[in-house]
């Protein structure tokens, strides 16, 4: 390298058919919808934004306190607060058309049908979405509040139903089954 000239490494990664400019992604729930704090980071320098969860209907989430600091870190229980899929499509998708970074939409549901309906709505309107992260750590109301990710058969059924709806990247957000 000559003095005064810097060479940037190629950090591109490929997942499925999508090529991301780098492996730096913001995780779902940590960065809102990716547009809330432009003064903090130029989102176009990120590999991807994984949005906060989207549900069929808007949700207020859990009452405060939602975040608690502990000596070992932080615990959060947001409760999937979000604007709902219709408002998301109306308000957020047009904003993403002006970004160069990839958008991964996190989808949450209470049963298989809700996940299917949300993905069908997204697929019918959006060309700016690179893929989906399917939040299966949500309680499955039709199974008595059990989380999808604890039931391998339900996880398989959900994955199969969603895979046929899209050719985009499909990421299953698994929950930890390890008890410490």
Question: PLM features: residue spans?
Answer:
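Residues at the N-termini of beta-strands
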Residues: 48, 130-131
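Catalytic beta/alpha-barrel core
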Residues: 135, 147-154, 169-176
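Active-site-adjacent beta->alpha loops and helix N-cap segments on the catalytic face
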Residues: 89, 141-162, 166
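N-terminal capping/small domains of soluble enzymes
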Residues: 2-103, 108-109
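Conserved radical SAM core fold
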Residues: 55-60, 136-145
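Short, electropositive alpha-helical surface patch
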Residues: 103-128
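Non-membrane alpha-helical structural segments and their capping/turn regions in soluble enzymes
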Residues: 82-86, 112, 116, 149-156
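Conserved small/polar residues in nucleotide/adenosyl-binding loops
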Residues: 178-180
């Amino acid at each position: 390298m000559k003095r005064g000239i810097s060479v940037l490494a190629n950090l591109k990664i490929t997942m499925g058919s999508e090529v991301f400019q780098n492996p730096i992604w913001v995780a779902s729930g940590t960065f809102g919808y990716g547009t809330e704090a432009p003064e903090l980071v130029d989102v176009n320098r990120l590999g991807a934004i994984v949005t906060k969860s989207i549900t069929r209907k808007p949700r207020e989430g859990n009452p405060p306190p939602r975040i608690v600091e502990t000596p070992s870190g932080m615990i959060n229980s947001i409760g999937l607060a979000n604007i709902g899929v219709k408002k998301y499509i109306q308000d957020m998708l047009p904003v993403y058309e002006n970004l160069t970074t990839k958008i991964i939409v996190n989808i949450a549901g209470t049963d298989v049908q809700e996940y299917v309906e949300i993905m069908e709505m997204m697929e019918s309107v959006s060309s700016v979405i690179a893929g989906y992260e399917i939040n299966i750590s949500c309680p499955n109301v039709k199974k008595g509040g059990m989380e999808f990710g604890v039931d391998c058969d339900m996880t398989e059924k959900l994955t199969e139903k969603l895979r046929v709806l899209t050719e985009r990247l499909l990421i299953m957000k698994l929950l930890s089954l390890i008890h410490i």
